[in-house]
Amino acid sequence: MADEDISLNEDQLLESMEETNGEQETEIVTETEEEGSMQIDPELEAIKARVKEMEEEAEKIKQMQSEVDKQMAGGSTTGLAAVPLSLEEKQEIDTRSVYVGNVDYGASAEELEAHFHGCGTINRVTILCNKADGHPKGFAYIEFGSKEFVETALAMNETLFRGRQIKVMSKRTNRPGLSTTNRFARGSFRGRGARASRACCHSTFRGARRAIRGYRGRANYYAPY
């Protein structure tokens, strides 16, 4: 009778050990599956990082344009009166303009005009500067005589200008709430016989090869930016 009890206890012990081992194996498999599901896909993370970078860059450009509008709204000049532009006129000008980023701080409007000369007739080159110290911000706007020239200018994206790779994008029209009228240039060059104006925000060069369409009969100076 004692032998039977010992044999029974041994059988129960073996069954208990097998069940325990089975549970441990199940836990190991489950943990392995969970670890596998938590692995990060490098390609997916790279795409997410790139999208975030593009969103931040777009927001930065948007903020810079808003800041420029606010600064230029308080600009003043001597001897020249600005002609207010309607929203429709502003939008039409923007369709003929491009944004140029990563511009060398020592670059002049004339140098930018020469760099984009082959794209078509240029009406205006505007280099934005800090209001406080007058130093360039590192970006500019170029207004062409026709919106067809914008497509050619966009092909200049990532070209080298003064040893730096510039970024060229279509100019976005600012929101109606941010006024773009009554603005002036910090050094304006308008062909033969034109006077230069002074303000705190930007400098411009305007080609004298062709008259600006749509502004005959207006005052001698206008500021679309």
Swiss-Prot record:
* GO CC, any one term: cytoplasm
- Compartments, as annotated in UniProt: Nucleus; Cytoplasm
**Could you tell me the Gene Ontology terms of the biological process aspect for this record?**
mRNA 3'-end processing
The answer, when asked if RNA-binding is one of the entry's keywords, is yes
Q: Which Pfam families match?
A: RRM_1 (PF00076)
**Residues in coiled coil:** 14-74
User: Could you tell me one molecular function GO term of this UniProt entry?
Assistant: poly(A) binding
Which segments show compositional bias classed as Acidic residues?
1-36
Q: Which residues cross the membrane?
A: none
Annotated segments matching region Disordered: 1-42
Q: Is Glycosyltransferase among the key words of this record?
A: no
Domain RRM: residue ranges:
96-173
Entries under CDD domains matching the protein: RRM_II_PABPN1
What are the entry keywords? Coiled coil, Cytoplasm, mRNA processing, Nucleus, RNA-binding
Q: What does this protein do?
A: Involved in the 3'-end formation of mRNA precursors (pre-mRNA) by the addition of a poly(A) tail of 200-250 nt to the upstream cleavage product. Stimulates poly(A) polymerase (PAPOLA) conferring processivity on the poly(A) tail elongation reaction and also controls the poly(A) tail length. Increases the affinity of poly(A) polymerase for RNA. Binds to poly(A) and to poly(G) with high affinity. May protect the poly(A) tail from degradation.
Domain remark from Swiss-Prot or TrEMBL: The RRM domain is essential for specific adenine bases recognition in the poly(A) tail but not sufficient for poly(A) binding.
The protein's name in its UniProt record? Polyadenylate-binding protein 2
Natural source organism: Drosophila pseudoobscura pseudoobscura
Taxonomic lineage: Eukaryota, Metazoa, Ecdysozoa, Arthropoda, Hexapoda
Q: Which gene encodes it?
A: Pabp2
